[in-house]
């Protein structure tokens, strides 16, 4: 009995998915705004199905009240009903919930001690001035170093693909300092930024975070602790 219910549910979901596929194809032809003339053959080409399948799906949509369909000697005319638009809108809202959150990602990392390089670079006025202007805060002279575990590396690689905030390189009498890509972030509600130098000897699984405060002290962190960083893309 339970298996029969599960099987029924599966086919119910499959039917809705198939209906949405056809509704979307019709909507892309402006059938939510006007009556469109379309043959079953044309629809079959749009959805990659046979002529018979396309005709059957149109009949199913009509039976469910999702479209109004009129057959005349001049052809087949279709318009999506309010019920059909509501089904499309619900699907749209589901996807909106998924992709609206794409503006941020969350990365977990293990705290570890660096060798003090972060303090040196963050203290350079050529960078600090841009941090204040572009990130909106004057950073504590130091970085929180995080080692990203393998299972989180997909999100770390995302940062390489994103544009981020460009911190321009500069030169002094002694040497040239390269560009840095930055992403604003939050750790336990505290603002900060991930900084990724274009030239670095650190491997890809290492991230450095700057903040107006010393994050280790503010959050009571020690080597080996894991923290979650919410990164704003």
From Swiss-Prot:
Cofactor dependence: Mg(2+)
Keyword Ribosomal protein: no
Keyword match Magnesium: yes
Family: Belongs to the archaeal riboflavin kinase family.
Protein name per UniProt: Riboflavin kinase
Residues noted as binding Mg(2+) in the record, renumbered to the chain: 143, 145
GO MF assignments: magnesium ion binding; nucleotide binding; riboflavin kinase activity; sequence-specific DNA binding
Catalytic reactions on record: riboflavin + CTP = CDP + FMN + H(+)
InterPro entries noted in UniProt: AsnC-type_HTH_dom, HTH_CRP, RibK_CTP-dep, Riboflavin_kinase_archaeal, Riboflavin_kinase_CTP-dep, Riboflavin_kinase_dom_sf, WH-like_DNA-bd_sf, WH_DNA-bd_sf
H-T-H motif-like, as annotated region: 1-104
Transmembrane regions: none
Pathway stated in the Swiss-Prot or TrEMBL entry: Cofactor biosynthesis; FMN biosynthesis; FMN from riboflavin (CTP route): step 1/1
GO BP annotations, alphabetical order: FMN biosynthetic process; regulation of DNA-templated transcription; riboflavin biosynthetic process
Gene3D superfamilies, sorted: Riboflavin kinase-like (2.40.30.30), Winged helix-like DNA-binding domain superfamily/Winged helix DNA-binding domain (1.10.10.10)
HAMAP family in the cross-refs: Riboflavin_kinase (MF_01285)
SMART domains xref list: HTH_CRP (SM00419)
EC number of the protein: 2.7.1.161
Binding site for CDP: 114-119, 213-216
Domain of life, source organism: Archaea
Top-level EC class: transferase
Cofactor binding comment, as recorded: Binds 1 Mg(2+) ion per subunit.
Sorted UniProt keywords: Flavoprotein, FMN, Kinase, Magnesium, Metal-binding, Nucleotide-binding, Transferase
Residue numbers binding FMN: 200, 208
Annotated function: Catalyzes the CTP-dependent phosphorylation of riboflavin (vitamin B2) to form flavin mononucleotide (FMN).
């Amino acid at each position: 009995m339970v298996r029969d219910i599960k099987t029924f549910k599966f086919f119910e979901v499959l039917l809705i998915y198939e209906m949405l596929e056809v509704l979307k194809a019709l909507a892309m032809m402006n059938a939510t705004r006007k009556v469109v003339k379309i043959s079953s053959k044309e629809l079959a080409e749009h959805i990659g199905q046979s002529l018979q399948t396309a005709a059957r799906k149109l009949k199913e949509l009509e039976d469910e009240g999702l479209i109004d369909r009129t057959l005349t000697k001049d052809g087949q005319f279709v318009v999506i009903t309010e019920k059909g638009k509501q089904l499309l809108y619900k699907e749209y809202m589901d996807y909106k919930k998924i992709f609206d959150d794409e503006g941020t990602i969350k990365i977990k990392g293990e705290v570890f001690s660096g060798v003090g390089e972060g303090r040196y670079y963050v203290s350079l006025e050529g960078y600090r001035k841009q941090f204040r202007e572009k990130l909106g805060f004057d950073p504590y002279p130091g970085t929180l170093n995080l080692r990203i575990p393998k299972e989180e590396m997909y999100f770390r690689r995302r940062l390489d693909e994103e544009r981020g905030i460009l911190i321009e390189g500069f030169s002094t009498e002694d040497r040239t300092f390269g560009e840095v890509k930055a992403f604003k972030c939050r750790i336990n509600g505290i603002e900060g930024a991930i900084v990724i130098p274009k030239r670095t000897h650190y491997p890809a699984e290492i991230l450095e975070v700057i903040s107006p405060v010393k994050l280790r002290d503010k959050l009571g962190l020690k080597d080996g602790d894991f923290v979650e960083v919410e990164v704003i893309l």
